[in-house]
């Protein structure tokens, strides 16, 4: 009997609802320097869909305020300029003005306690996201790191009418299959959009 080949995207992506994401963001103490930092980080994760490592490697030089863009070092050594939404920009500005400790370090986000240096990897960003979820009372995602906000953004965009192609471009998916996986959470939307997606409705 031939073995059954398991498709690598067979499982549904885990995501938070828009209301849950808002609850996580609202749970940040934006009156404290650490809270401002964490809020800005969570905004980048939830509004731009950045990966934990992409947030950790952002530097002060990567932000072009005049152009309203941010240079992101993406997976696979890709580099791309992303537009900064007003609410995301406001969160970053609030952190830089009233939250970021004085430091010669060029990383955008630094540790709250001395030494005020950047994070070595995305692990710290993942922990910040996990603590924020737990603080908001959102449990049951023990194995989900910061990536759950990326999944949530893609799912919300799909349900708001964005095409799979647009979502794939925003999240820099190399494979169409990666983006199609998000469509599984809404079969009705998948059927409506598949005709405009390469290889769809076969």
What is the role of each PLM region?
Residues 1-202:
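Conserved catalytic core of the tyrosine transesterase superfamily
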